[in-house]
Amino acid sequence: DIYWCTADIGWITSHSYILYGPLSNGATTIMFEGIPSFPDYSRFWQIVEKYRVNQFYTAPTAIRALAKQGSSFLKNCDLSSLKVLGTVGEPINEEAWQWYNKYVGRNNCPIVDTWWQTETGGILISSIPKVIPDKPTFATKPFIGIQPILLDEKGDELKEFNTVGKLCIQYPWPSIARTIWGDHKRYINTYFSAFENKYFTGD
């Protein structure tokens, strides 16, 4: 597959999902220097067409910025090579999700909404194309082997639907950050002191 993640190369997303991830899985990866609005707002879609991109991974901020320009910049671009779309970096709102689905995915590409952090080393919560149905604005299910838990302020598990709590991960996973360089106490205090024996995400 031809895979394109539009993240800035200095961010963990690009380390994991432009370099290490795609290349270690035998994919062809695209590195892009520039902004999606220059020389005009069709820049992303011209690249998708030129290189026949199959998997496209970008941030909701970029999607919202492009959606504000309408759909005219996509009309003359062939996006038929796209098979999977992804979002990363922040929650995606309903309007942006629907625009992405309709105009970029042509209502024919699963949208993989991902949740993770620099400290997690990789995606922990995400839909899986063709396995878990898309649900607009939701990252949906934990990835294989990941066991998230929602806690109240006292550390008790919340099992009700549509409730607000503190997102934690119950057990370690292979890519978890091991420490903060030169300050292991800070690492423990930041991620493991709020709730005993659980990784606190801050979300």
Label the predicted regions:
Residues 157-162, 168-203:
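Conserved ATP-binding/catalytic segment of the ANL
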